[in-house]
Every structure is written in structure tokens, then in C-alpha cells.
Amino acid sequence: ERVEAAGRDAEALCEALAALEEDFTRITDTASQRAKDSGTAPNRSLVHSDTRRSATARIGGTVLDAMAPLDPLMTSAAWLMGRLGARVEQRAVEVYEKLSAASGEERVNLADFWFASMPILHGGAVTDAQEVLAEFQRRWARIIPLPEGEARVRASHSAVASQVAEAFPPVPVAWSAARYLSPDVLIAARDTGAIGRGDFELVLGELHLASNTMGASLFVSQHPEPAELLRLTGRDHPGPRLLPLLPKEHKARLSTRVRNVLVRPEDYYVALMELTADPHRDRTVLSADAHVVRRDGRPVVVLPGGAEFPVTDVFGHVLTTLAMDMFQLFPDADHVPRVMVDKLVVSRESWRFTGGELGFA
């Protein structure tokens, strides 16, 4: 309360922060700030301040129409996630069969299954991601060839869309978060007037896979209508979800600012390693109380109340971590040209070199 009351008064804010840290250390006998390392979340102090710009940007139909080439990109991204999920699920089947054979039981305890899957999630699944991406890029190379020495390559949305539909057929959603795609799109124009005249280009910065950026705590907490975001989440997921609880520390260096908070009362949490949810929250399940069985040849998780979910949902965070930055249309090379589909730059021009190749180095 004292920190909040200090507002923009720098001197009062420093005093309030110092007092808070002193109280925390006295009560917990723990340092109020943590040292930065590979396993420490970005936010290492007790409190932080988030702000929202007062400016509001609105875009019209002209800009939205120019975003149409995102559609075939997203179609191919869905294929990419589906293939990755299918590969990991097949590895999960092998783990299940091994544990089931060893115990002589059709039901395998989820806690045992999770720990037996560790070599897959941090080994085989990484290889799967690399191989699936390589195939993804081979298919895109046939859709948009990159002539050697060219600085600019152009293609039309209609031509690309028809080829993408053939090269990347629909696949089932592999895990619940794989419904989401979060593109970062920049507008390149001299000024707002130029945009109105249609004199602009769009640039795809990144296309994040299996992640709803708007679900991050820092966005939800500052959104004018968080309830609306939860309502829309219900449209994306008409039924309950099974969400793995994240450990207190994670090598991905997650923080309270970016954790997904669009979680509804009907969603289930499963504690795989640490129980980091509200201990009084309903629908929080310990992995030791759940089981893995096969349904129509596919592994599913059965919760104590009888609810069932694809086993890939248990791996959801690991799969999202693998997939989030996978989207790359063309492999790295000494030179990759700028590739445009209509008004959208889908791949920016890039160069790769070593220091020894540079005359001034």
C-alpha cells in the first residue's frame, strides 16, 4: 500500500520499496532480491510496475485486407504444430507401452509416466522439432523458390494460398494451446495519411505458435475488460482444459508477468512436479492421482473424476516451448532475400557471416 501510495514521487517510492524489502527480509529471513541466473525468472524483486500507453491505434479495412496473406502462413503453421504433436505422441505411446508391460496393468500412473517421459521431452522431442521444421521448409521452398543472388522475391496471395492448401493439409489440433497463433505485424509507411491512401507495406516480425499473447498476466491485468477475454477463451475452448502447473522455477525463465491467466473455473490443473496453484482451488489434480490409458490406440489421461484428455495436453507447456519460435519459412543461409506476398513481407532480408570474413574485423 505504501509503494502504491508513493506513485510518481521518486523519494517516497524509494523509501517505500526499502521498507518493503526490510519487512520481507525480517519476516521470511530471505533476501528480498534474487540473483540473476539461468533458472531465475526475469522479475527478481518483490514488486514491479506495469504501464499502458494512453495512445490508441485503430486500423481499417485497407490494412486488414493487406493481412490476408497471413492466412496461408497460419495454415502451414497449424500443419507444423500438428506434425510435431503427432511425433511426440508416438513417443508417448512407447513410454506407455513400456510402463504398462512392466506393471502388467493397462492403467499407468501419470506421475510415473511423466518422469519416464523426461528423456523424450528434452531429447527426442527436440530432434522431432528439428526434423519437422526441415520438412516444413522444404515444402515452402517448392512454393516460393529463392533464386540465388536475388535481393527481392515477390509472390501473389492467390498463388501461394492454392499451393499451401495442397502442401499442408489439415491435421488435428495436437494439444489445446495449438489452437493459437500470435503474429507480430509491423506497418511500414511514411505517415498515417500514406496508410489511408494504401501507400504502405506490412512486415511480419514473428509468428508465435501455440501461444495466446493476450493471455499473459501483464496484458490481462491492464485490459479494460478481462471478463471479455475469458468469454472469448470459452469460444476457443468450449469444454474444460487440462493445464500443467508450472514449477516455481523453470529454465524458460517464466515470470508472473507472462504466465497465462486466462484460466476458467472449469479448467483442470495437473501438478506434475510442484503444487504451485491455490491449494483451495477446485479441479487441481496431483499427477499421482491420475492415470494414462489407451483409447482407440491413443494415450489419454484419466482424472479421478473420470474426465479424459489427450496425453499431449500434459506436455502442453513443453510442446509450446518447443514450437513457439519454430516458424521460419526458409532455412538460415549466407543470404536470404526479402520475400513479399502481395503487401506483406513474410521473410526479411538477412545475411550471416563470421567475423573473419569482415575486412574491418
Predicted regions and their residues:
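Type-3 copper protein
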Residues: 1-236
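Acidic, serine/proline-rich low-complexity intrinsically disordered regions
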Residues: 124-125, 135-361
